[in-house]
Amino acid sequence: MNSEKPLFSFFVTSDVQLTEQDHVSHQKLASALQDIHEVDPETETLIMNGDLVNNGERKSYEIFQQIMDENPHPNQVYYTIGNHEFFKNDGNEPSIQRFLDFSGLEKVYYDATINGYPFLFLGTESWGPVGSPTKDSAVLSEQQLQWLAEKVDVLKQENKPVFIFLHQPIPYTINGTDIEYYQNGVIQDKEVRKILSQLKHAFLFAGHSHWDLRYPSMLVKQSTNFVSSGAIYNTWGLDEEGGEIVTDPAGSQGLYVKVFHDRVQIIGRDFSTKQWIPEYTHTILI
């Protein structure tokens, strides 16, 4: 890897899908945190982009926090809500509240400034019903979209990259999002696209699909840079019938992002083998 020192760096992960009884999920989270620390012990920021827990249970959040406390990790950890945070299936409000209690946030959408660069975090505000083709979709309220539009209206005046995080990917972007299940992945996808297209250098990171970062087109450069961040719990891919299937139950992946004054470098990391993913090394000029 290039020895030039970046302005700053951060890691992006998603889809830990931890539960109390699934000790493999505990081990994978701990292993990922340890590898992140070994790769760059000086990085100060980690984004965990949804599906932190598999069932939305408060006990799962408690174990998640315990593992975080027991392992080295960057000082600043930012969370987004995914679809699995709703899987206790007791309604939107209690599901969201458990996530907010865990994360210490006031809303599922918020912003931060990290090393002088803007970060925007989005999140679904509704889930279900079970059996619906939009059960796992991201639903963004008018208030959230208005908030995003107002943030972008200010940020579009700058030439800095803007880093945005939403658990579900925008349909018809990264590989796999043309599959039927993902076609309704973000109900307000057209609105989000339109808002983000005003930015000169927008990076929208998504998890959810678990698709192996070794596949082509897991980062797509359109008016916005659409970025897949892999998954900690396992990796998926295309099956022989045009659907998707688990390709590696032991797979565990995430991203290492380095920001320079003239470019952003995004590199895939295999936490299970503690190796870089050469197929997922991207440099986007600013």
Which residue ranges define each predicted feature?
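Active-site neighborhood of phospho(di)ester-bond hydrolases with catalytic His/Asp-centered motifs
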Residues: 12-14, 45-51, 77-83, 163-166, ...
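Surface-exposed cleft-lining segments at the edges of enzyme active sites
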Residues: 18-21, 51-53, 126-141, 175-181
